[in-house]
C-alpha cells in the first residue's frame, strides 16, 4: 500500500521511499525515512495535493509523489493530552565561548587566532521559514523583507553586524539540505564551498529540532567554525516545553545559543559566541553521527565503517579540490553528481568505492541514500529524546488548524480566496487607497502652486519656469499622487504573505495550475507580480525545476504590477462612472490572468513540454504579521517609488518637456506640432492607428512607459499642458479601454526586463519577452477594437 491510499486522519509507518533522482533524495532529507510515522491531515479542495504530518511538522505533496512512498501498519493515532512537562532549565546557557569546555574546543582549532579587527565573514544558514531573515535584520539593522512563506530569501544578502564593523554576515536562501535539489540550495552550497566563510551561524526552529538538525549535521561536516542559534525559544517556553541547552551542546560539539529573533532576545550572546569561534577557528568537535559503539545496531556500524573508508580513500582528491573530506565522503555515498564530477575518482578508486557501497547496502538492507538519511535521523531522534521536553500542542498550531478549516476547507477555500482578493481590490481602488490618493493629490497640487507662485515672484526666466512647473512638478506630481494606492496594495499583499496565507493559496491552487503545466509554488511569484514584477521574477528561484522557473518568469508580466495603477486610475476615473470603476479594474486584472493561462497552454505544448515540478512544500503555522515587518516593507516600497519618481520619472519628464518645447533646430517650437517630440511620435503613431489611438502623444507616452510604467501618466500630463484631466481630449471611453488593455499586456519596464535577462541567462530571452509581450498586447487590443467596432461601440 502507498501513502496516496491513506484515508483522512489515518496514520502509518513508512516502509520504503521509491523513485529516483533529486526528488527521492529531497523526500529523504525532509525526514521521510523508513519507520517514520506519518498522518494524513488534509486533502486539498480539488482532491490533490495532500497535507501530512511528519516529524512534528506539516508537509504537502501531490498524490503522484505520495504514491512513491510505501507504507505499512495503518492505524488511528492516539492523541493523548500531554501533562505539564518538567522543565530542564537549571542554567540558561553555559559560559562565554563555552569557557567550561574551552579546552576541548580549542583543541579542534583549525587555524591561528585571527587578530582583533581582522575581517570575519559569516554565513547565516537554516531551513526555510525558521526566522533567518528576521535574525539577519537584528544582526545588521537591515530591512530585508520578512515573510511566512517557504523561500522568502531568494538571493544572498550581505550586511555588517552592528557594533562589529569587522564582521560581515551573508543571509543565504533557506534550504533543507546541502544536496542540489533547487536553485536556492545550489546558491547556498556554492557560497559555503567556494567562498569559505570564517564561520557559520546555523539558525534552527527550536519548536521543531527534528526537522532542522538534518541540515545542521551536513553543515558540521564542512569543518567550518559554527554556532547553533535556537530560534523561537519564547514559543517553546510559552507552550510548556524546554530544551537542555548544555546537553544539546555537548552532544553536537558546537556552541548552542537560545534566542528569539523576533523579540531580539539572546542576539548579543549569539554574536559574541559567533565571533569567538570564528576568531579562534573552533570547528565542530563531532562530525561522526554513527553511534555504533552505543548499542544502537550493527546497521549503523556499517554506515560508520563505509563513511570512514570512503573518506580515507578520497582524501587526496578532496584536498586537491579544496573540499572537506568528510563532506565529500557522505555526498559521494549519496550519489551527489557535482561532487562526483569535482573529485573525478580514477577507475580503480571508483571500483573500490562501489564495492564499499555494495557492502553498506547489504549490511543495512537499505540503499545508499536511505542509509545516510537513516543514520542522520537516528542520531537526531536519539539527541531529541535526551535534550527536548516536548511542549503541549502549540497555540500557533491549534490556531492554524482552526483557521485552515475555513481557508483550506473543501467548499470554503476558493470562495474565501475570492472574497479576500475582492476585499483587497475594494480597499485599494475604491475605499482606503482612493481616499488617500485624493488627499495626496490635494497636497501635491498645493505644493506645485506654491512653487509656481515662488518662481513668479522671483521673476525666473519663463522657459526655466515652464520647465520646472510644467515639466518636473507636473510630471512627478502626477505620479506621486498615486503613491497611497500602491502602498495600500503592498500592505495587503504583505499581510497575506507574513500571515502564512500565501502558502495555503499555493496548496489550494496546485491542481488548477497543474492543468497549465505549473505547480502551486508558481502561484506565489505570480501573486507577488501584482505588486512588482522584479521581486516576483526573483522569487522564482525557490522553484526546483528549471522548466517551471522559466515558464513562471514568462507568465509573471501578465500579472498587472502596481506601477500600472496610475495609468488605470487616471483613465478609469476619467471615463467610467464611480460605481463601475472597481469592476473595470477587476476586469483588467482578470484579462491579464486569462491571457497568462492561454500563453501557458501554448508554452506547455511547444517550448516547455513535460511535467510540472513535484509539489513538496512545508506549510508554516499562521502567525500574526509583525507590525514592524509590515511597516518596513511599506516604507521600502514607498521609498523605492519616490526614488523612482525623482530619478527615472524626473529625467523622463524633463526630456519630454524639452522635446515637446523645442524643434529639431533647438529653437522654441511655435506649437507642439512643430516639436521634436511630435516628429518622433508621428513615426510610431501609425503602429497604433489600427487600435484607435493614433495620436502621437499617446504613442510617445507608451514609449516612455518602457523605462517606468508610471512615466506614461507623467508624459501625458506634460503633453497635456500639466492638466491630466484633459485626457478626455485624447480618448473616448471605448478607445480608453483599448489603451488600458494594451498597457496591461505590453512589455514590462526596463528593471523587469533586466531581471529577466539575469534570471534566464541571456539577452536573447529579454529581447524575446519584449517582442512577444508587445505582439500579444497589439493583437489582443486589435481584436477587441475590431469586435467593439462591429458592435457599434466605436
Go through each PLM region and give its residues:
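Alpha-helical transmembrane helix bundles of large polytopic membrane transport and channel proteins
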Residues: 227, 237-392
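Conserved C-terminal guanine-recognition region of P-loop GTPase G domains, centered on the G4
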Residues: 164, 187-256, 567, 574
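Extended, low-charge hydrophobic alpha-helical regions
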Residues: 363, 370-374, 390, 431-472, ...
Amino acid at each position: 500500500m502507498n501513502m496516496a491510499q491513506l484515508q483522512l486522519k489515518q496514520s502509518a509507518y513508512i516502509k520504503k521511499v521509491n523513485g529516483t533522482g533529486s526528488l527521492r533524495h529531497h523526500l529523504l532529507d525532509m525526514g521521510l525515512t523508513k519507520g517514520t510515522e506519518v498522518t494524513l491531515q488534509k486533502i486539498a479542495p480539488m482532491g490533490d495535493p495532500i497535507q501530512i504530518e511528519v516529524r512534528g511538522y506539516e508537509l504537502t505533496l501531490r498524490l503522484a509523489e505520495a504514491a512513491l512512498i510505501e507504507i505499512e501498519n495503518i492505524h488511528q493515532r492516539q492523541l493523548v493530552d500531554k501533562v505539564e512537562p518538567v522543565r530542564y532549565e537549571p542554567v540558561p546557557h553555559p559560559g562565554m565561548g563555552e569557557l567550561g569546555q574551552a579546552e576541548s574546543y580549542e583543541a579542534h582549532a583549525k587555524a591561528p587566532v585571527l587578530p582583533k579587527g581582522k575581517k570575519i565573514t559569516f554565513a547565516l544558514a537554516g531551513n526555510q521559514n525558521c526566522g533567518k531573515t528576521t535574525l539577519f535584520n537584528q544582526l545588521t539593522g537591515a530591512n530585508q523583507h520578512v515573510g511566512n512563506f517557504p523561500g522568502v530569501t531568494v538571493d544572498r544578502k550581505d550586511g555588517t553586524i552592528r557594533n562589529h564593523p569587522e564582521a560581515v554576515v551573508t543571509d543565504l536562501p533557506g534550504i533543507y539540505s546541502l544536496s542540489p535539489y533547487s536553485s536556492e540550495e545550489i546558491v547556498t552550497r556554492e557560497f559555503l564551498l567556494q567562498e569559505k566563510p570564517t564561520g557559520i551561524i546555523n539558525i534552527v526552529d527550536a519548536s521543531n529540532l527534528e526537522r532542522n538538525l538534518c541540515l545542521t549535521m551536513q553543515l558540521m561536516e564542512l569543518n567550518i567554525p559554527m554556532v547553533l542559534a535556537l530560534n523561537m525559544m519564547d514559543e517553546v517556553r510559552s507552550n510548556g516545553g524546554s530544551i537542555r541547552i548544555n546537553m544539546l551542546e555537548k552532544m553536537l560539539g558546537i556552541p548552542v545559543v537560545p534566542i528569539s529573533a523576533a523579540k531580539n532576545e539572546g542576539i548579543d550572546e549569539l554574536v559574541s559566541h559567533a565571533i569567538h569561534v570564528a576568531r579562534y577557528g573552533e570547528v565542530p568537535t563531532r562530525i561522526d553521527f554513527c553511534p555504533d559503539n552505543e548499542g544502537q545496531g550493527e546497521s549503523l556500524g556499517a554506515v560508520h565503517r563505509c563513511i570512514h573508508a570512503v573518506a580515507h580513500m578520497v582524501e587526496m582528491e578532496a584536498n586537491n579540490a579544496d573540499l572537506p573530506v568528510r563532506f565529500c565522503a557522505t555526498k559521494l555515498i549519496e550519489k551527489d553528481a557535482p561532487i562526483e564530477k569535482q573529485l573525478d575518482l580514477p577507475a580503480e578508486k571508483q571500483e573500490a568505492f562501489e564495492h564499499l557501497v555494495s557492502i553498506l547496502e547489504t549490511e543495512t538492507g537499505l540503499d545508499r541514500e536511505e542509509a545516510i538519511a537513516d543514520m542522520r535521523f537516528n542520531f537526531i531522534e536519539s539527541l531529541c529524546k535526551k535534550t527536548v521536553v516536548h511542549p503541549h500542542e502549540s497555540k500557533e498550531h491549534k490556531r492554524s488548524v482552526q483557521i485552515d478549516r475555513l481557508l483550506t476547507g473543501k467548499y470554503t477555500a476558493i470562495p474565501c480566496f475570492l472574497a479576500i482578493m475582492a476585499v483587497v481590490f475594494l480597499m485599494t481602488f475604491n475605499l482606503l487607497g482612493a481616499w488617500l490618493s485624493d488627499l495626496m493629490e490635494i497636497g501635491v497640487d498645493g505644493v506645485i502652486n506654491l512653487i509656481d507662485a515662488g518662481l513668479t515672484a522671483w521673476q525666473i526666466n519663463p522657459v526655466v519656469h515652464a520647465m520646472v512647473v510644467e515639466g518636473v512638478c507636473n510630471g512627478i506630481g502626477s505620479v506621486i499622487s498615486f503613491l497611497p494606492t500602491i502602498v495600500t496594495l503592498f500592505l495587503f499583499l504583505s499581510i497575506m504573505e507574513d500571515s502564512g496565507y500565501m502558502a495555503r493559496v499555493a496548496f489550494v491552487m496546485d491542481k488548477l495550475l497543474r492543468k497549465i503545466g505549473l505547480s502551486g509554488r508558481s502561484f506565489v511569484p505570480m501573486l507577488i507580480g501584482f505588486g512588482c514584477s522584479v521581486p516576483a521574477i526573483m522569487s522564482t528561484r525557490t522553484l526546483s525545476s528549471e522548466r517551471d522557473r522559466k515558464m513562471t518568469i514568462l507568465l509573471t508580466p501578465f500579472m498587472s504590477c502596481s506601477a500600472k495603477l496610475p495609468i488605470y486610475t487616471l483613465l478609469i476615473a476619467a471615463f467610467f462612472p464611480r460605481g463601475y470603476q472597481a469592476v473595470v479594474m477587476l476586469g483588467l486584472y482578470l484579462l491579464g490572468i486569462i491571457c497568462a493561462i492561454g500563453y501557458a497552454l501554448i508554452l506547455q505544448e511547444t517550448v516547455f513540454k513535460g511535467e510540472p515540478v513535484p509539489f513538496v512544500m512545508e506549510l508554516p503555522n499562521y502567525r500574526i504579521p509583525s507590525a514592524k515587518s509590515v511597516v518596513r516593507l511599506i516604507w521600502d516600497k514607498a521609498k523605492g517609488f519616490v526614488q523612482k519618481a525623482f530619478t527615472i520619472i524626473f529625467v523622463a519628464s524633463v526630456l519630454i518637456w524639452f522635446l515637446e518645447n523645442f524643434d529639431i533646430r533647438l529653437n522654441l517650437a511655435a506649437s507642439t506640432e512643430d516639436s521634436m517630440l511630435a516628429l518622433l511620435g508621428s513615426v510610431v503613431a501609425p503602429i497604433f492607428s489600427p487600435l484607435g489611438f493614433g495620436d502621437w502623444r499617446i504613442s510617445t507616452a507608451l514609449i516612455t512607459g518602457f523605462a517606468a510604467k508610471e512615466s506614461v501618466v507623467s508624459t501625458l500630463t506634460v503633453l497635456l499642458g500639466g492638466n491630466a484631466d484633459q485626457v478626455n481630449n485624447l480618448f473616448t471611453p471605448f478607445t480608453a479601454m483599448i489603451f488600458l488593455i494594451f498597457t496591461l499586456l505590453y512589455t514590462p519596464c526596463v528593471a523587469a526586463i533586466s531581471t529577466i535577462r539575469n534570471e534566464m541567462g541571456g539577452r536573447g530571452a529579454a529581447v524575446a519577452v519584449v517582442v512577444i509581450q508587445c505582439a500579444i498586447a497589439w493583437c489582443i487590443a486589435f481584436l477587441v477594437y475590431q469586435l467593439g467596432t462591429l458592435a457599434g461601440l466605436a
